Design a protein with these regions (language model features):
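An edge-strand/N-cap motif at the start of beta-rich repeat modules
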Residues: 8-31
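Residue position within the beta-strands of beta-propeller blades
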Residues: 15, 70, 114, 165, ...
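Short loop/turn segments immediately following the C-termini of beta-strands
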Residues: 18-20, 30, 73, 83, ...
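Structural motif
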Residues: 22-26, 77-79, 122-124, 172-175, ...
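Short loop/turn segments immediately following beta-strands, especially the blade-tip
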Residues: 27-35, 81-88, 127-134, 176-183, ...
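A short beta-strand motif characteristic of beta-propeller blades
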Residues: 38-50, 90-96, 137-145, 185-191, ...
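Beta-rich, blade/repeat-based domains predominating
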Residues: 45-64, 97-111, 143-162, 192-210, ...
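Aromatic- and glycine-enriched pocket-lining scaffold segments that form the walls
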Residues: 113-128, 135-199
Length: 314
């Protein structure tokens, strides 16, 4: 079973199996001072790929926590669940993704975009209905920056005016301007400061924080920060080292003062202090803010209140 991403709502934590025999959402609960407890598994009615997706945000909660959206990379569709006030899930729709091998999702208000990695890859947009339906937006499908670019994540900035896609194999970041109808422009391509840009997040000041895996080279990973500009990206902090290996997933606290990257190749988590202007400073000299254990390969992460949840296979 290939556990994929994490999402957090109230005291419920979600991940998915990405199983080829049938993808499922695994639901856990927590409480003050208590360990995570397994609650239930909920079928998506789609299928996975039985392997790692190599992406961030394959499972996302809507802004107000009412909807949970999951990719089914093996059946090329998206499952949408209603989330009740206790964190229980009810499947409301399955929708073709507009491509093959969907691996990442993003939501802003009623807009949802999916990143399809199969073939040459694309992004495709939908309107999220009050009933949980996803209606394709005409003319919203856009190509990526080229062929075999190794996409990792799609995400909106805080305003919803720009879509961002990281391209691992090309070491580029693609930017799409989104018009008032929710339709993106052709991609504007920016060269990543560091190699193998992977996961990213926007902090509360709309600084773009991007993890850089540097091809998994030992001790070479980093995180960079950027400011979005009309003509592309302005670098704020360039490749601030984790001193760890394969930094792939990155999350920022709600107030934006801290960010954390999971170092899959090292079994560690690296923390950063984030200034309003995007300046990044590692919290420790060795880049180790947390240890998930030898061979644990931490992948995705989610923040809930003062808790950092890290998905690590043992």
């Amino acid at each position: 079973m290939g556990l994929a991403p994490l999402a957090f709502a109230g005291h419920a934590i979600y991940t998915q199996t990405n199983a080829g025999a049938g993808n499922q959402i695994l639901v856990f609960t927590d409480g003050p001072g208590s360990p995570l407890q397994w609650r239930e598994s909920v079928p998506t009615l789609g299928i996975g790929t039985d392997s790692g997706l190599g992406s961030q945000s394959a499972l996302v909660l809507s802004t107000h926590g009412q909807w949970l959206l999951a990719v089914n990379a093996g059946s090329n569709d998206i499952s949408t669940f209603h989330v009740d006030r206790h964190g229980h899930l009810t499947l409301t729709s399955r929708t073709p993704s507009g491509g093959t091998e969907p691996i990442s999702l993003t939501q802003h208000e009623d807009l949802v975009y999916v990143l399809n990695a199969g073939g040459n890859g694309n992004i495709t947009g939908f309107r999220l209905g009050d009933d949980g339906s996803l209606d394709p937006i005409p003319g919203s499908t856009r190509d990526l920056g080229g062929n075999a670019v190794g996409p990792a994540q799609v995400g909106f900035d805080r305003s919803g005016d720009t879509l961002v896609v990281t391209e691992k194999a090309a070491s580029r970041i693609a930017l799409y301007a989104v018009d008032e109808d929710g339709v993106p422009s052709a991609p504007h391509l920016a060269v990543s400061v560091g190699q193998t840009p992977f996961g990213f997040t926007f902090d509360r000041h709309d600084n773009l924080l991007v993890s850089e895996a540097f091809g998994g080279a030992p001790g070479a990973s980093a995180v960079s920060s950027y400011e979005l500009e009309d003509q592309g990206l302005e670098t704020e902090s360039a490749s601030v080292p984790t001193h760890q290996s394969a930094a792939c997933w990155v999350v920022a606290t709600r107030r934006g003062a801290f960010a954390y990257a999971t170092d899959t190749g090292s079994g560690t988590v690296t923390g950063y202090r984030v200034a309003r202007d995007g300046d990044l400073r590692a919290l420790t000299a060795d880049g180790i803010s947390g240890i998930t254990g030898p061979g644990s390969a931490p992948t995705d992460a989610a923040l809930g209140g003062d808790e950092l949840y890290v998905l690590a296979a043992n």
